[in-house]
Amino acid sequence: MSYIQEQFFDIGANLTHKSFESDLEEVLFEAKEIGVKRMSITGSCLEDSIQAAEMAERFPEMCISTAGIHPHNAKEYSPEMFSEIKALLKKEPVKCIGETGLDFNRNFSTPEQQQLSFEAHLELSLIHISEPTRPY
């Protein structure tokens, strides 16, 4: 009987948070020790997206990153700023768009601000819709 070792990919590592500044390498080591093979460092605003890309460049064997604007940060959205997000998507470690979406639970940004930001993200996305005329 063969043994299959479980390996995990963490799709939403919020490692740009200031609480990880002093021990990032230790966090990555511990993640690897418990079976995390790779992880995606999440960008939730322009600054975090830049920082996430830099982290992923430092640890390419384990990390990739995302670039995007979280709904809570949508109040920061502008077409000029989003051009910088798009430019980040051309960097090697940046593999995904996001974090993005709509979050009307706490409304740190207005619904209108969230919609503008989300629509900009959608324009960059590949969307698959099966049987779009069929009502669900």
Regions found by a protein language model. Name each.
Residues S2-D23, L46-L126:
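Active-site gating/metal-coordination segments in enzymes
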Residues V36-S40:
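Short active-site oxyanion
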Residues T42-C45, S130:
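Catalytic beta/alpha-barrel core
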Residues I127-Y136:
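Single conserved hydrophobic/aromatic residue that forms the stacking wall/gate
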